[in-house]
Amino acid sequence: GLQRHDLRTGHSREVRVWPEAGYGWAPADLKYRWHWNFPLSHSPHTQHRVYVGSQYVHKTDDEGQSWQVISPDLTTNDKSHQQSSGGIAIDNLMTFDGATLFAIEESKVQKDLIWTGSNDGQVHITQDGGKNWVNVSGNIDMPKWGTIANIEPSRYDAATAYISVDMHQMGDFDPYIFKTTDYGKTWTKISNGIPKSILSFVHVVREDPKQKGLLYAGTDNALYVSFDDGKNWMLFRNNMPPAPVYWLVIQENFDDLVVGTYGRGYYIMDDISLLREYAAAAQQSSYVFNIRKAYRFQEVEAIKTDAPSLNAGRNPSYGSPVNYFLKDSVSGGVQIEIYNDQQELVRTLKGTNTAGINRVWWDLRYEPTFQPKLRTRPPGRPWVEMNAEGWRPLVTWDLDLWKGQLGPRVAPGKFTAKVKIGGKEFTETFDVLKDPNTTGTEQEIQEQVVFSL
């Protein structure tokens, strides 16, 4: 089935291409053949346009109200792969149906350039929105009957695309990633560095949206990264378990890598922007990465319940991360100074001093303020006692200062980080932005900060 769901209202409606249930029927007997994981893709150029794939490419421009077939059969249409699944109960749940499309993607840089891949090794391309299709499968040096697991059209060049080919159902567990730079006329295998094992077959390859040549790939047990456009791959795991990586999405606003794994699990690596500079950083004895923009978020208290939460995730650290690379630990340590746009020192932080990539979080606060001391009792509260020194603390919940133990959060604006490593000093500028969910103006926030100081 296929549904359109409105997140604003919670309403859903069925928008399947053809009102025919395939359960119990051999695929060869159906009008359209659908895989259990049939491809669905949104057009990056035309609002409301969506593509889905059976053995054909179907297009809608009205969010599923009507559909148009824009291709011939783009599979081998081998009838021997379209029979009943067998077993005691012939369910035909489309889990193993052959001769179906498995991947559809439209180019992000050239409208109407669409790539398709099938689960029987067929790759097609059209450059006119489906009027004419070219089969480029024969140009790829790959074994027969592979599943074109995903297609990644490049956002830097219309003629370039990447594909991953999954052969494990044919008893071949090797990694297959291919790249073309001429609209599929020629292809190069680019999977060097992914070790061969029974879990090496590739589910997905993804291009970094901001750094040409930086690629990510997911196999059946790991995540890999390439800094040289696929010529060489290296394991990219950290604390991620050896899970089958089925899908990758990069959240471009915060540069977070979202990893979807088999079993409906997902993992998030926060802020992968430093990977775009890593090749240059690794050649230096010390290097400070660009600092991304930070939001002055206000924490939102969740509704308290007694039921245990099954959510294993947690929010990233609050504030702005300062990332730097050290080839070796340095004498004298690392010190970080934060200045505002008036070149006034806001905060001094002590950095970690270990070989490799270091990350220090600035919580967007000034140095701790002086503790307020009230020397009078509150009006009408004669029972309130002073301490031995003759004063009582000001409880500044509304000012978010925690009795003077914290400094106020800075107002939105431009800031500079001076990172002192050994005898070197590096300077990076960055923005602190207002929480878009708050109603206070930047002027009001500035006045509150001045008052808190």
How would you describe each model-predicted region?
Residues 1-310, 317-323, 329:
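Beta-propeller blade termini and top-face loops
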Residues 279-453:
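Extracytoplasmic/secretory ectodomains and luminal regions
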